[in-house]
From Swiss-Prot:
Pfam families: Apocytochr_F_C (PF01333), Apocytochr_F_N (PF16639). GO terms for cellular component: chloroplast thylakoid membrane. GO terms for molecular function: electron transfer activity; heme binding; iron ion binding. This is Cytochrome f. Residues 1-35 form the signal peptide. It is found in: Plastid, Chloroplast thylakoid membrane. Component of the cytochrome b6-f complex, which mediates electron transfer between photosystem II (PSII) and photosystem I (PSI), cyclic electron flow around PSI, and state transitions. Binds 1 heme group covalently. It is a single-pass membrane protein. Belongs to the cytochrome f family. The lineage of its organism: Eukaryota, Viridiplantae, Streptophyta, Embryophyta, Tracheophyta.
Length: 320
């Protein structure tokens, strides 16, 4: 009886351990897969530096285009679309962290003027919701509602990202005025080349850390290489570690120089930034403009009628 209870206890403990391990694995995988925007959030208080450079460029080294479309002007307390376009060749495949090839993901950061923010769900129209799809936006900081981030998300489905934006109302927010405002955007496609701690990913070129002769290249069991470089002058050895997924450009017995590329460049993605302008329009100014245009049209009509009346008078006088 005691033995049976012991086995039962052991079985329960094993089951509990497996369950806990599985939960930790799932949480870890989820945090890693959604970590890219968090890299910037954890390391930079503001994603846009004083020079105007968006900090995502510190990890995504290649330059690629990005575009943004916003209305020329919006009225207070209205919802509008900010469409970020991240174009790239959909046939391209990138090197994943496990060394295999896979589809590119995309991400974006949208820096709005103070007072502008993500529109609440109940203010978004069904048509706009259809354009947004299953995207989930988040604030860069809890106290920075005007800075939004998204990604990584599948690039083949979301190379165009629609942000639903709520315009502020100066009547309720005294810090907002009827002015022309700048909007800044950054967008990337594919993985970065450098992690926030300065270490390289396997999506970049690896260079020789020393000059000399390549005496040995060992292919590691789980992928990647160990390249041994020997300096002929003093027989000093240096071992360069190449992560999995990269293609070697060198071979054993080859003479190489310091900083010479050991691998080809696998990166097919890149980062770009752009800007746009939007006017927060005063409704009274719009009404005034409409009134002015209406008065001009009426004045033109009266002039035409007056001219016709004058011509009739002249014609009648000529008949006499």
């Amino acid at each position: 009886m005691q033995t049976r209870n012991t086995f039962s206890w052991i079985r329960e403990e094993i089951t509990r351990s497996i369950s806990v391990s599985l939960i930790i694995y799932i949480i870890t995988r989820a945090s890693i897969s959604s970590a890219y925007p968090i890299f910037a959030q954890q390391n930079y208080e503001n994603p846009r530096e004083a020079t105007g450079r968006i900090v995502c460029a510190n990890c995504h080294l290649a330059s690629k285009p990005v575009d943004i479309e916003v209305p020329q002007a919006v009225l207070p307390d209205t919802v509008f679309e900010a469409v970020v376009k991240i174009p790239y060749d959909m046939q391209l495949k990138q090197v994943l962290a496990n060394g295999k090839k896979g589809a590119l993901n995309v991400g974006a950061v949208l820096i709005l003027p103070e007072g502008f923010e993500l529109a609440p769900p109940d203010r978004i129209s069904p048509e706009m919701k259809e354009k947004i799809g299953n995207l989930s936006f988040q604030n860069y900081r809890p106290n920075k509602k005007n800075i939004l981030v998204i990604g990584p998300v599948p690039g083949q489905k979301y190379s165009e990202i629609t942000f639903p934006i709520l315009a502020p109302d100066p009547a309720t927010n005294k810090d907002v005025h009827f002015l022309k405002y700048p909007i800044y955007v950054g967008g990337n496609r594919g993985r970065g080349q450098i992690y926030p701690d300065g270490s390289k990913s396997n999506n970049t070129v690896y260079n020789a850390t020393a000059g000399g002769i390549i005496s040995k290249i060992v292919r590691k069991e789980k992928g990647g290489y160990e390249i041994t470089i020997v300096d002929p002058s003093n027989e000093r050895q240096v071992i360069d570690i190449i992560p999995r997924g990269l293609e070697l450009l060198v071979s054993e017995g080859e003479s190489i120089k310091l900083d010479q590329p050991l691998t080809s460049n696998p990166n097919v993605g890149g980062f770009g930034q752009g800007d746009a302008e939007i006017v927060l329009q005063d409704p009274l100014r719009v009404q005034g403009l409409l009134f002015f245009l209406a008065s001009v049209v009426l004045a033109q009509i009266f002039l035409v009628l007056k001219k016709k009346q004058f011509e009739k008078v002249q014609l009648s006088e000529m008949n006499f």
